[in-house]
Regions:
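Walker A/P-loop
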Residues: 62-99, 126-127, 156
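Conserved catalytic/switch belt of AAA+ P-loop NTPases
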Residues: 137-182
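Active-site phosphate-binding and catalytic loops of NTP-dependent enzymes
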Residues: 20-24, 58-65, 93, 119-121, ...
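Short loop/turn elements that form and flank the Walker-type P-loop nucleotide-binding site
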Residues: 64-67, 90, 115, 128-133, ...
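AAA+/P-loop NTPase substrate/partner-engagement loops
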Residues: 89-118, 124, 144
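Conserved alpha-helical scaffold flanking the Walker A/P-loop in AAA+ ATPase domains
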Residues: 113-137, 168-175
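The Walker A (P-loop) glycine that initiates the GxxxxGKT/S ATP-binding motif of P-loop NTPases
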Residues: 73, 110, 139
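Extended, charged alpha-helical coiled-coil/arm scaffolds that mediate oligomerization and mechanical coupling
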Residues: 1-61
Length: 186
């Protein structure tokens, strides 16, 4: 057996496990969605209205790209649990990626050298098993820039609707469509 066999097998397993065409079906009943959000969170009226507005437009046309929602507030007000409630209300899988203290962009987009792995975006997609989850990118304000790169610039590429249909993880080295993901930032 070749010494590279394990590396090749690992790459193929990652490639085969990316949920290229597997997606969950969104709940589109606005009354049910609103009830689920109200049952789990008191207040947050504007945030709930924005989610309902997105679902209403999405139910008319599937051409609408997923919005990027930014939840702002002091610690402990329920931003993370509200993001989880959105995913449950929409019947989508939920992924949380903590960005606090991240200083290496390769953590998000993987690395290409031998023995490396995909970044958190791809591994999270594989873990959740669908191509349209709700992604919570937590503590975006705590990203750090250093000699390893600027994860904020990488994050901009991931979130930009004109680019995220053709996202390329450095390890996978194939285009992955992230446009169906509902990104929520805190």
């Amino acid at each position: 057996m070749s010494p590279d066999a394990g590396i090749i097998r690992n790459y193929i397993e990652y490639l085969l496990n990316v949920p290229w065409y597997t997606e969950t079906r969104d709940e589109r009943d606005l009354i049910k969605i609103e009830k689920k959000l109200n049952d789990t969170h008191y207040g947050m009226k504007k945030a709930k209205e924005r989610v309902i507005e997105y679902i209403a437009v999405k139910s008319i046309t599937d051409e609408v790209s997923s919005p990027i929602i930014c939840l702002v507030g002091p610690p402990g007000v329920g931003k993370t649990t509200f993001a989880e409630s959105i995913s449950k209300a929409l019947d989508r899988n939920f992924v949380k990626i903590s960005l606090g203290g991240m200083s290496d962009s390769a953590e998000l987009v993987g690395q290409a050298y031998i023995g490396s792995n995909p970044g958190k975006i791809v591994t999270s997609l594989i873990k959740c098993g669908s191509n349209n989850p709700v992604f919570l990118l937590d503590e975006v304000d705590k990203l750090k820039k250093d000699y390893k790169g600027d994860p904020a610039s990488t994050l901009l590429d991931i979130l930009d609707v004109s680019q995220n249909k053709r996202f390329v993880d450095n390890y996978i080295d194939e285009e992955i469509d992230l446009s169906k993901i509902l990104f929520i930032l805190t």
